């Protein structure tokens, strides 16, 4: 079965799909977001999924700061401090998110950041990711200043 190929239980798949659902703004990006998390799990990395920390904090925040992440460091849902998937779903995933969790893109993406338009910039290396984050900060700062910079070319700092 596909779950056996992925070395995941049904519960783990639903948990991963719930993270993909919470992270994605565009359904077309779900398989790429899923690939990042599958790749991180495969390589033993922390997932570092913002939606899981927001879940641990009890809900949305306008911005996720390191102090907030640290405040729930011991939570099993804090994927910045706890390895692997959290113990359960953080929401109800839709069919597209479940399909993306089952069938991630075959890319070696390890990182992504959100752009002001809600789409994501996917990268393979830390150097690429750091450049994307720097671009993101500038784009979000322009947006906060009321300067139209939401052309989709700059990602959101996460």
Predicted regions mapped to residue ranges:
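Bacterial extracytoplasmic/cell-wall-associated proteins, especially those involved in peptidoglycan
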Residues: 1-158
